[in-house]
Amino acid sequence: DKGPGFVVTGRVYCDPCRAGFETNVSHNVEGATVAVDCRPFDGGESKLKAEATTDKDGWYKIEIDQDHQEEICEVVLAKSPDKSCSEIEEFRDRARVPLTSNXGIKQQGIRYANPIAFFRKEPLKECGGILQAY
């Protein structure tokens, strides 16, 4: 029983300070690969694996065709094209998205995921001063 389709959209950025949030030296990542992963609430196998690549502004769009009422769906980082900013940190590499139509959300089937980030292995030298400003 397929429900209406959804478009999941969001942005991928590089966190050069490993801050866990965007700073004035963060930048969007073009050409990053993200996947949508859905698994049952009861912890079974993850099901849907739709992938997309980010555009020049770091945005992606993934079309998904059925309702995932009984599932937890997340957008997960898969691959960074930028070798200097390609570290993935567990739990910070994903954003949960509601993919059901009965959650009172009626945005023409568009679901916005929170921005997710790749990290630099070594923070930039100027990060100490930058982070003090936040």
From Swiss-Prot:
<keyword id="KW-0020">Allergen</keyword>
<feature type="disulfide bond">
    <location>
        <begin position="14"/>
        <end position="85"/>
    </location>
</feature>
<dbReference type="InterPro" id="IPR006041">
    <property type="entry name" value="Pollen_Ole_e1_allergen"/>
</dbReference>
<dbReference type="GO" id="GO:0005615">
    <property type="term" value="C:extracellular space"/>
</dbReference>
<protein>
    <recommendedName>
        <fullName>Major pollen allergen Lol p 11</fullName>
    </recommendedName>
</protein>
<keyword id="KW-0325">Glycoprotein</keyword>
<dbReference type="InterPro" id="IPR006040">
    <property type="entry name" value="Allergen_Ole_e_I_CS"/>
</dbReference>
<dbReference type="Pfam" id="PF01190">
    <property type="entry name" value="Pollen_Ole_e_1"/>
</dbReference>
<keyword id="KW-0964">Secreted</keyword>
<feature type="disulfide bond">
    <location>
        <begin position="17"/>
        <end position="127"/>
    </location>
</feature>
<keyword id="KW-1015">Disulfide bond</keyword>
<feature type="disulfide bond">
    <location>
        <begin position="38"/>
        <end position="73"/>
    </location>
</feature>
<comment type="similarity">
    <text>Belongs to the Ole e I family.</text>
</comment>
<feature type="glycosylation site" description="N-linked (GlcNAc...) asparagine">
    <location>
        <position position="24"/>
    </location>
</feature>
